[in-house]
Amino acid sequence: MAEPIKLFQYNTLGALMAGLYDGSMPVGELLQYGDLGLGTLDSIDGELIVLDGKAYQAKGSGEVPEVVEVSPDMTVPYAAVVPHQAEVIFRQRFEMNDKELEKRIESYYDGENLFRSIKIHGDFARMHVRMIPKSTTERKFAEVAVNQPEYCKEDITGTIVGIWTPEIFHGVSLAGYHLHFVSDDLTFGGHVMDFVIKEGVVELGAVDQLDQRFPVQDRKYLFAKFNMDEMKEDMEKSE
């Protein structure tokens, strides 16, 4: 019997929405659980991109974004990684926008209630990303996100990594597509807002199990009070 493919998630996106930004898991430890994924860094300092077992940070405050490789001792307040194994691979041979490509991707899904890992390498006519700005305050994520910088790049080659989450797990993660991008030359990246792909290769991976871990040593998390309706509303605004 094949080894089950586990999606490893540290903390929940809902906790991040509530303003719990302190990193408590080292990136080096996180990478033991998967080679593809996403998240953010301590104090929500930019976007975390995990590709081929390496972790990158995309952040921006000026006219151009910055992408750097993340050291193993940096910490995350929230992240999700998976040992990506492509179950479906197809070539996208003509131009599509993100919504059109998502419909094609979903035609390969077996049902609607399993997580999926996603990896798309290609040439993009347009890539629109944002980066959450660093915050050490107790301001909620949606408030911080109002000032997040956005960047758009045309004619760029790179990789989208992401997780598709079923609706029944909304709150644990973001229902639907959560995608991050990094260019081949490591000069551009971030949380994907929208894109137009010219051509590329799409890989879809199965997920058999969810390994959900919690920051059990973090007193802020242990005693936090969550307003679920407000949290879901903030997730929809921010993501």
Task: State where each predicted segment sits.
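Compact, glycine/acidic-enriched structural inserts
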Residues: 80-93, 208-233
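N-terminal low-complexity or amphipathic/hydrophobic leaders
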Residues: 12-81
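Long, positively charged binding patches that form subdomain-scale interaction surfaces
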Residues: 99-163, 168-172
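A hydrophobic, small-residue-rich beta->alpha segment in the mid-to-C-terminal subdomain
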Residues: 183-226
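Short helix/loop capping segments that flank catalytic or ligand/cofactor-binding pockets
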Residues: 58-59, 128-129, 171, 189-191
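N-terminal charge/polar-biased segments
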Residues: 1-16, 217-239
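N-terminal, charged amphipathic alpha-helical interaction modules
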Residues: 52-125
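Histidine-centered divalent-metal-coordination microenvironment in nucleic-acid enzymes
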Residues: 174-182
